[in-house]
């Protein structure tokens, strides 16, 4: 039986934390999130926090976006953003560096929903098939997204119809990711 998005995300998150520990002998550290509350925080030091992904007590669906744009969003999208809190995680997909976007806190979830709603409104105005971003790349004009119609994970050139299929679904995409830990 294939892995669910929830299982694949949990597996990648665990691989990421283990890779960080192997390289730095501690939990992941972040300097940019200091001062932002999150259930992920394990320890706060002067200019950095240590953190680890935390599974939500109950998975959520991002209905605010669906209601705002009057569009049912793909189940993989809800599973990806609605099952855990985490800092963003860097990874490699084949030869492409990405930063997997995550929800740090409930406040961050509100921000994500606003950004996603704006993204979908822009796509509707441009008459593009709706996509749901899940990661950024080194090229600020390209994002990794879930195609809302097919569920395929694609490399999406923002504001254009240029799209390249990366994986048949989100679970497959997550399973192919390799954690990248900065030195």
From Swiss-Prot:
Primary location class: membrane
HAMAP family, sorted: Syd
Keyword line: Cell inner membrane, Cell membrane, Membrane
GO cellular component, one term: cytoplasmic side of plasma membrane
Protein name: Protein Syd
Highest taxon above the source species: Bacteria
Pfam family, one: Syd
InterPro entries: Syd, Syd_sf
Family per record: Belongs to the Syd family.
Native organism: Aliivibrio fischeri (strain ATCC 700601 / ES114) (Vibrio fischeri)
Location of the protein in the cell: Cell inner membrane
Job of this protein: Interacts with the SecY protein in vivo. May bind preferentially to an uncomplexed state of SecY, thus functioning either as a chelating agent for excess SecY in the cell or as a regulatory factor that negatively controls the translocase function.
Membrane topology: Peripheral membrane protein
């Amino acid at each position: 039986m294939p892995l669910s998005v929830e299982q694949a995300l949990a597996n990648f998150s665990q691989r990421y934390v283990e890779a960080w520990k192997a390289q730095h002998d501690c939990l992941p550290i972040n300097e940019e999130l200091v001062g932002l509350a999150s259930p992920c925080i394990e320890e706060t030091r002067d200019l950095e926090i240590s953190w680890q992904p935390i599974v939500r007590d109950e998975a959520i669906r991002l209905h605010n976006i669906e209601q705002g744009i009057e569009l049912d969003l793909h189940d993989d999208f809800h599973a990806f953003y609605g099952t855990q809190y985490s800092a963003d995680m860097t990874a490699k997909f084949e030869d492409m560096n990405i930063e997997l976007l995550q929800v740090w806190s409930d406040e961050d979830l509100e921000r994500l929903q606003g950004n996603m709603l704006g993204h979908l409104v822009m796509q509707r105005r441009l008459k593009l098939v709706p996509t749901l971003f899940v990661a950024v790349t080194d090229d600020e004009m390209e994002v990794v997204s879930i195609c809302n119609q097919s569920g395929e994970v694609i490399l999406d050139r923002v504001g254009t119809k240029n799209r390249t299929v990366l994986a048949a679904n989100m679970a497959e995409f997550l399973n192919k990711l390799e954690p990248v830990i900065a030195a």
